[in-house]
Amino acid sequence: MRTASISRRTAETDVSVSIDLDGTGKATIATSVGFLDHMLELFARHGLFDVTIKVEGDLHVDQHHTTEDTGIALGQAVAKALGDKRGIARYADIHLPMDETLSRIAIDISGRPFLVFRTTFRVEKIGQFDTELVREFFQAFAMNAGITLHVETLYGDNAHHIAESVFKGLARALRKAVAIDPREDGRVPSTKGSL
């Protein structure tokens, strides 16, 4: 079973995450940041990952630490659940439409963390959520999952739709990249023999 649990406690947040990469999309999310909860529920559903996340954060300051630390812990959980990465597809990409928005996401589960994020928002907030925190989440996730992640919104107007397209795109691409390829016959998908 490709599952993992992570607990991460700092002076700013207390985060617990569990994930089953071979789940059915069940989500139990409680970050106390409504928009982030919504995005993480989409991530679980569209990735077909079973995800439980509970966060207590310093929301009296703002939502930054809660969002970033959730990305860190979720990334760590994905990396742990993947183990030595034997048999995975490794690479995946997707174009994800959301009404007037189209985003492109590409992933390499390489062990070399990197983020290219070419998504902009015309507004500073979606409800009470700072739009700049979308990038902060993706940065934290990619660095801690150990993946190369390219995120680009080709076009779009509505900030909610843009955020939704990149979170759903991440989920759908990650779902394909972590999938077991039976032709790999349990090998690590690299000429080096490790990732």
From Swiss-Prot:
Pathway: Amino-acid biosynthesis; L-histidine biosynthesis; L-histidine from 5-phospho-alpha-D-ribose 1-diphosphate: step 6/9. The lineage of its organism: Bacteria, Pseudomonadati, Pseudomonadota, Alphaproteobacteria, Hyphomicrobiales. The keyword Repressor does not apply. PROSITE patterns: IGP_DEHYDRATASE_1 (PS00954), IGP_DEHYDRATASE_2 (PS00955). InterPro entries: IGPD_sf, ImidazoleglycerolP_deHydtase, ImidazoleglycerP_deHydtase_CS, Ribosomal_Su5_D2-typ_SF. GO terms for biological process: L-histidine biosynthetic process. The gene is hisB. It is found in: Cytoplasm. This is Imidazoleglycerol-phosphate dehydratase. Its EC number is 4.2.1.19. Keywords: Amino-acid biosynthesis, Cytoplasm, Histidine biosynthesis, Lyase. GO terms for cellular component: cytoplasm. Pfam families: IGPD. It catalyses: D-erythro-1-(imidazol-4-yl)glycerol 3-phosphate = 3-(imidazol-4-yl)-2-oxopropyl phosphate + H2O. It is an enzyme of class 4 (lyase). Belongs to the imidazoleglycerol-phosphate dehydratase family. The keyword Oxidoreductase does not apply. Its main location: cytoplasm. Disulfide bonds: none annotated. GO terms for molecular function: imidazoleglycerol-phosphate dehydratase activity.
